[in-house]
Amino acid sequence: MNKRAQIKEGIFYLGEEPIFLVTADYPYYRDDAGNWDDRLKKIKNAGIDAVTFYTPWRHHAHKSGDKIELDFDGRTQPNRNVKLFLELCAEKKLWAVVKPGPYIHAELTFGGLPDWAAAEKGSGIEPLVNNKGEPMLDPFRPPGGYGRPMPAPLCKKFKAMTKEWYRSVYDNLIKDSIYPKGNIIAVQVCNEGLYSNGPAAITDYDYSDSALELYKKFARRENVRAPRRLSAVKKISDLRDYLDWARWQSEYMRLVYTEFSSVLRGKVPIVINLNPPSEGRGLDHWLTRVIPESWPGINYGFTNWLRPVSEDRVSFDRYSLLSKRKRGINFEENWGFSKLYDYHFQYPVVCVFETLLAIANGATGFNVYTAVNTASWDDSIDCQHERPYPDSSPIKEDGSLTKKYEVLNLISLFFEVNGPEFLRCEPDATVAWGLYPPYAYLAAWDIPKEDWDRFHAEPVRCGYEALDRFQRIMRDRNGDFQIVNLETASPAELKRHKFIALYGGFFMDGKTQKKLASYSSAGGRVIFIGEAPHLDEDFSDCRILKKKCSRLLKMEEIGDIIGCGNKKLHVSDPETQVWAYDNPDRKTQFFFVLNLSTNAGARHFSYEGKKAAVVLPDKSAAVIKIKDGKIDSVFIKGINEMNKTSVVPEAAFGKDRFKAKTACDVLALRQGKKWQIKISA
């Protein structure tokens, strides 16, 4: 049997067994090496499958004259002995996800890059520059401090330095420890885009000479130019430069990911961790750059770092889109930072709500970032942040355990028992949003309506005032949906959906029009909001979809046509948010229930005619597994520490009931006629 680690369609597998991956980050480089064994033991006992950890270039590499010395075994400093750290993980039967950067952020000086990687004058390293020719400076420098120029990733010298760093990490740490020989199951390349700037505008980078030279080859047009600002669009052909530059953004990221990780290709799964889109028009910029279907061998993953989604609906929506863009593992969920980011995150209920929202929207695993508070690092890697780092993790800096640890153990055990079966269930796929990337390419430029009027076209929309509004309409009806890339999806992928809706534009390439027309002829329904395409990619007449689609004048009409999509699920209260995953062959369902209201009590829904209810405090969450029509497993967060409210957790499905004996957080697993119950009070 093939037991190698792999990721298929966003799901982690060992051999042919799907595994819901529960991971925890431990910044060993910020802790005393003497603490590692104890902390890893406690991480394992919390139900964690794998430890994720950055290997900071700045921490392990030191320059002596012109010579760079690397330390992976602690000969210069004990907490540089990452080889020992990896061995201790293996001893505890913890898998490992290694994150070599090169830029890692992690609140380290210069994002963990060594000083000699800065694009200083005379260094021979190009800076990353924006449309104004301004170099990007270290985005997380101390207030009023010197900002080192960030290197252009595809600059010949920096690229060679990075590949040499990756080769060193591979040779010294990864090569002999790849699963099944060792415990390394994946390697993460880069961090939240390039420099934690994944959501940046398409004119923010990269106008360096090295990038522009590659762009010219990519565009394959004579006299191609990289637009630095929006000029008046006087004729339809003026759009080509804007389309090409926007299309280049995703290809640019593919080049960075694949160049940096070339030594790893085909040897270990490679993952990335993308951060959420910005508000408003930022969604179009993000959709332009994030096209994972075009990154073969690079597996989609994501982070969070928004305001608490239980307290802020905009963050709720942005995080949902990030989780839903493509199935993948959540590689950073804030379980530890309340002082540095938002005070709400000191409370376990906030972390649980975020975690379950991501899973409900498609995450195939989650990460506790970080599992451990640390307090033993030197100023060479961070002279800015106070100790401990972070401030409210499940395991404190002295090794003591917290309420978060107890709750984490309950969630981890739920997915340890039920993870494979959950991953064999499917979310509702009745409705899909048709993502047509070229619409994002133009929408990101925010072209004025008067320019569109010159060639009698409606403004093109994709994310902002399109996908975001569609999601809000669907969630207000408790409707789930999937996102399908119309350019890359196969006919079989389209066939999974009864409805495909999108905000229309005046053009669409002929190949995609034909694909959608075939989908429509086979019984699917294509719904354009606004304009339907009548030109192809060359802006020539092409009306393949004219009689193969429906048109709506207003987005608000969409709900009346498709309802909530899933005819099995009914929820009357929009403040009770429910997601259903189903495997009819196994007679198994999972329900994620999130209470957005400020009221505690029963949250009601029905599925296939069976009434269901979960008793929750305000702003809390639960997950329930149903097997053969009965409650099989349940996790209910019955305590809201932030608002000092609590309930006696209870769940009902049809005539079947589970009720705890006291106000608590509870995990209940059915074993025959009895329940195995664990609580945190």
Short names for language-model regions:
Residues 1-50:
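N-terminal carbohydrate-binding accessory modules
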Residues 20-24, 51-53, 96-100, 185-189, ...:
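Hydrophobic faces of well-ordered beta-strands that scaffold small-molecule active sites
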Residues 27-34, 59-62, 68, 73-79, ...:
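Acidic-and-aromatic substrate-binding clefts and catalytic sites of carbohydrate-active enzymes
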Residues 65-75, 91, 102-146, 178, ...:
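Aromatic- and acidic-residue-enriched segments that line the glycan-binding/catalytic groove
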Residues 158, 163, 170, 177, ...:
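Carbohydrate-binding surfaces of carbohydrate-active enzymes
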Residues 29-45, 282-290, 348-357, 489:
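Short, acidic/polar
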Residues 36-120, 261, 507:
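Aromatic-lined substrate-binding rim segments of carbohydrate-active enzymes
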Residues 78-92, 96-98, 117-189, 410-421:
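An active-site-proximal structural segment forming one wall of the substrate-binding cleft
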